[in-house]
């Protein structure tokens, strides 16, 4: 029977050592400036450790059931149950601290940055119901932040639409102005062509008049000479 008790204590000490290791990993991750894929790999490693830790606690609970009723005092049995319960509470706290740290990027977008170690200190000492309540509060605050962000995005979208409509109007006005300029240019060219034709016709008319006057002058001169010859 002592062997069963000793095996339980060995298993408990292993679980306790693992919990301390996980705490160290979480603290190291909290104080590290690593982001991106490396941070995700660290988080995955911690999550695997927490899963193993939970399995060890299940094994401790099963071992307690096996030694129940054997030569071990009720007080010792209750003490060991409390020891397992404390480790399970610690497992929940570590899991929730890890979940809180995964919100870091989202928090930095929506509002004040909540560091993972701050989340760990806040959930320390809380029971499961308190931890769940704290998580719900954080999620509610994040949802409110998302609503505010959505409002800002919608406002920006409306401004962008108004600017786009104004640009379309200005484009149409410029197109209309180009059309009127083309029409005016075409009319100006027609007027210039008409003026050129009129100028050419006027020049032709002046030449004919000059020839007519020349002929009349020659005829008049011939008449004068004839009269002078006749009456001399």
UniProtKB/Swiss-Prot annotation:
One of its GO terms (molecular function) is SNAP receptor activity. One of its GO terms (cellular component) is vacuole. The keyword Membrane applies. GO terms for biological process: intracellular protein transport; vesicle-mediated transport. Keywords: Coiled coil, Golgi apparatus, Membrane, Protein transport, Transmembrane, Transmembrane helix, Transport. Expressed in root, leaf, stem, flower and silique. It comes from the Eukaryota. Pfam families: SNARE. It is found in: Golgi apparatus, trans-Golgi network membrane; Prevacuolar compartment membrane. The chain crosses the membrane at residues 209-229. Gene3D superfamilies: 1.20.5.110. SYP51 and SYP52 may have redundant functions. The exact location of the SYP51/SYP61 complex is unclear, but is probably on the trans-Golgi network because of the likelihood of containing chiefly VTI12. Belongs to the syntaxin family. Vesicle trafficking protein that functions in the secretory pathway. This is Syntaxin-51. The gene is SYP51.
């Amino acid at each position: 029977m002592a062997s069963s008790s000793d095996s339980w204590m060995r298993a408990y000490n292993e679980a306790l050592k693992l919990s301390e290791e996980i705490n160290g990993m979480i603290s190291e991750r909290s104080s590290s400036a690593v982001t991106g894929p490396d941070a995700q790999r660290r988080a995955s490693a911690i999550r695997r450790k927490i899963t193993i830790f939970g399995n060890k606690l299940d094994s401790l609970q099963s071992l307690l059931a096996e030694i129940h009723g054997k030569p071990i005092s009720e007080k010792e049995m209750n003490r060991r149950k409390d020891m397992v319960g404390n480790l399970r509470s610690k497992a929940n706290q570590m899991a929730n601290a890890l979940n809180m740290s995964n919100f870091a990027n989202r928090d930095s977008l929506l509002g004040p940055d909540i560091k993972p170690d701050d989340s760990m200190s806040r959930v320390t000492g809380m029971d499961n119901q308190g931890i769940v309540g704290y998580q719900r509060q954080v999620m509610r605050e994040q949802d409110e932040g998302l609503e505010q962000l959505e409002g800002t995005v919608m406002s920006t979208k409306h401004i962008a639409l108004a600017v786009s409509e104004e640009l379309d109007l200005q484009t149409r006005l410029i197109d209309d102005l180009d059309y009127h300029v083309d029409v005016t240019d075409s009319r100006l060219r027609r007027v210039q062509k008409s003026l050129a034709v009129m100028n050419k016709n006027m020049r032709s008319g002046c030449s004919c008049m000059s020839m007519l006057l020349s002929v009349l002058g020659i005829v008049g001169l011939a008449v004068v000479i004839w009269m002078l010859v006749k009456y001399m």
